[in-house]
Every structure is written in structure tokens, then in C-alpha cells.
Amino acid sequence: MTFLDALPDSDEEFRQLAQTWLHDNVVGKFAELKGRGGPGDEDIGFDIRVAWEKALGHAGWIGLGWPTQFGGRGASVSKQMIWAQEYTLAQAPARVNHMGEHLLGPTLIEYGTPEQCTRFLPGILSGDERWCQGYSEPNAGSDLANVQTKAQLDGDEWIINGQKVWTSLAHVSQWCFVVVRTEQDSKRHKGLTFLLVPMDQSGVEVRPIVQITGGGEFNETFFTNARTGIDMVVGTPGNGWSVAMGLLGLERGISTLAQQIGFERELDNVIALARSNSAIMRPVIRQRVVQSWIGMQLMKWNALRSMSGGVPGPEASISKLFWGTWHRGLGELTMDVLGVESTVMPDSEYSLEQKLFLFTRADTIYGGSNEVQRNILGERVLGLPKEPT
């Protein structure tokens, strides 16, 4: 029996429930990670954050919005928003399985077989199994349709060869969902398949990529005759593009809700910093702080609108375009609030504020660049002609 076996009907009762649980549980070693684990700081206290993930799962806080028949809580959009708000206010530890809960889980619910759901959803809900995403390649980043990693059937197994890059948390994940090319003469979107691949095997090599912040969240992942079962295809062979795009819609659609947990914390820290060093007294800084706060509120409203409409479609690109630009701007604002201190490394590593600035330089690129998002919106939402090639 979990803490959340029965959700209260009232949003206010639910808020009180969330507040009470977070107050009682963000203590001890978990309280030591308050405000940590954000951009450029992902390696901090990882073992503690894994334990926190399991605590969330044991109490029933993972999969709040999943349908009850799949082990979720069937929580309304408003309750999911309340949980995000209270999580932020409690400064609870940063999550380690966003990929599993918010991306793969809903994708399996939408496209997976009953056997796949039975096998994988409980591990996500309990916090016991972590997932990473194998999409980008050296020559297939924003142009994802150029995937070159291949998989061939060998009896009842797929044999996978190729390379993925920018694989977040691959070094600490047990499974990876991978887009591969299974029809060898196919081009672009055709002939792709969505596979679930175990990471703990000799055919998978993970090499960390040291970022400009000094952190190592991202990795190169090499598949050399790696294997996975024939039953590990999500959807059907050759139709992986549709599954991958459905997942990207979830990523870009829920990101303004899930990521706002960290965003609000960062904005609060910037405001506190501006007050403490009197930067808030400068009219330009004060105006930019207000603009950032307004942007945060707009992202919340857009998240509610996106989630209330069911599975996000191409309009989810609005979310990615919005938060990528907003977050990069927050990093720039942080440096201006710091002033000349922003150019000096205080110790052997960058400060959290400097890490935020350095990390957010990539926000308008990864997960689909701003240029790609504008093309999607122009072509699929506004009906404009495709960009000439």
C-alpha cells in the first residue's frame, strides 16, 4: 500500500497532502541536496538521488498522470501542476528518471504491447529501473531522420551496430530506447524501428562527454553487435518514426511542466541573488527579472493547455521553442546580476551560477534546435510551404 493509494477529490486537500509528505521526507541526506542537481550540476549526490527516486516510487508519487490501469494515479492536470509547484517549494532533490516516467512510460502506454507494459512500467513506477534515450548521432542531431545506426534480425534477436551521442545519463541507466534503421536501403523517415535495449552487455560501450561546465551528464554510446529480443520493438518494425515523433511530442509538450521544477528554483535563486547584492536596484536588471517571471507564468499556462489536450502534436514545438529561449536568457541574466564576479572562477570549479550560464548556451540547440522547431510550426501547424532544400 502506498502513500497515494487514494487521491483526495479536492485540489486543496491534494496540495496539503503533497506539502506534508515533502516536509516529512526532504530531511537528512535528502535535505543536503536542496537546490542541487540542476544544469551543470547533474553528478552531485547521484546515489542519494537514486534513493530519493525509490522513495518517491514507494510513496506513489511517480506516474501521477498515468492511467490507473497501468499503475498510475490518474491525477488531473491541476494536481500534476500542484505537485510540480510543491516539489519546487520544498527544494526536493533533482530527479534521475525523467526519461522513464515522462517519455518512455507514456510511449509504452500509447504504442507498446501488454507484455512490454507489464515488464517495464512497474520498474519505472518503483524507481528501480532508469532509462536513457538513444536518438542523436554524430550526423543525426536535429536532423533525426538521418539515423545510421542499424539493426538486423538474427533468429529471435536484433543485432545492433552504430553510435549514439549526447545520451543523457547513459552511464547510470539500465535500459535505452533506441531509434535504429532496420531496412538497410531505406532513406530518411522510412525503415526506422524503435527498440528497447539493455545497457548491461558487452556490446554496449558508454564514454562520458565532459561538458564546458565540467560535468559529465552526456555520453557517447557505441553499439557493437549489441543484442535485444525480437519482442523489444515498440510499435512495428519500420514504423519507428511515428513512435519516435510521438515521444518527442511528449518531451516537448510536458517539458514546460516537468522542467519548471528546476526553472522556478533557478529563477528564485537569481531573484535572491539580485536582492542580496543590490543588483535589483538597477532598472534594467529589475525589468529583466520581471520579464523572466512573466515568462515562467506563461510557460505554466502553456503546459496546462498542452496537457489538457491529450497527447501533444507538432504544436508541442511551441513549448521547446519557448523554454529553450527563456532558459538561455535566464543564464545570461544570472551573469549580469553577478556582475564582474561572473568572470572569476572562485575555487577549483565553477559556481552554480556560472554552470547555469554555460549549460544554457545549448538550450536552443539540443532536443531540436530553435530553427527546427520553427520549421515544424510553420509547416505542420501554419501550413506554410517546406523550406527549400
Where is each model-derived feature located?
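N-terminal glycine-rich flavin-associated loop
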Residues: V96-E115, G141
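A short, Trp-centered hydrophobic/proline-enriched beta-strand micro-motif
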Residues: G127-Y135
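Glycine-rich phosphate/cofactor-binding loops in nucleotide/flavin-utilizing enzymes
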Residues: F3-L4, S78, I82-W83, A94, ...
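Amphipathic, small/basic residue-rich leader segments at the start of a protein or domain
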Residues: M1-H98, R119-S126, N269, S276, ...
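A structural signal for short hydrophobic beta-strand segments in well-ordered beta-sheet cores
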Residues: T149-Q152
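C-terminal helix-coil-helix/basic helical segment that borders enzyme active sites and/or dimer interfaces
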Residues: F30-G40, R275, A279-R286, Q297-S348
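Glycine-rich beta->alpha junctions and the first turn(s) of the following alpha-helix
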Residues: F3-L7, E13-F14, V204-W301, D363
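A short core secondary-structure module
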Residues: D156-E157, N161-R207
